[in-house]
């Protein structure tokens, strides 16, 4: 029996909270700006 992979969920994660999705909306850009200010190495997923 084959094991279940996480390919689908990681794709969904990118589509929901990826960098390009964040840059689309005003609030998403605010999230990126805040994370840059805090010095996060990972701005988005």
Curated annotation (Swiss-Prot):
Gene Ontology terms, MF aspect: structural constituent of ribosome
Organism name = Synechococcus sp. (strain CC9902)
Family per similarity comment: Belongs to the bacterial ribosomal protein bL34 family.
Annotated protein name in UniProt: Large ribosomal subunit protein bL34
Q: Where is the composition biased (Basic residues)?
A: 10-27
UniProt-annotated stretches for the region Disordered: 1-27
Q: Give the record's GO CC terms.
A: ribonucleoprotein complex; ribosome
Which InterPro entries does the entry link to?
Ribosomal_bL34, Ribosomal_bL34_CS
Extract one GO BP annotation from the record.
translation
What keywords are annotated for this sequence in UniProt? Ribonucleoprotein, Ribosomal protein
């Amino acid at each position: 029996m084959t094991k279940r992979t996480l390919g689908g969920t990681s794709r969904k994660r990118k589509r929901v909270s990826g960098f390009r999705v964040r840059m689309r909306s005003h609030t998403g850009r605010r999230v990126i700006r805040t994370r840059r200010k805090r010095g996060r190495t990972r701005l988005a997923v």
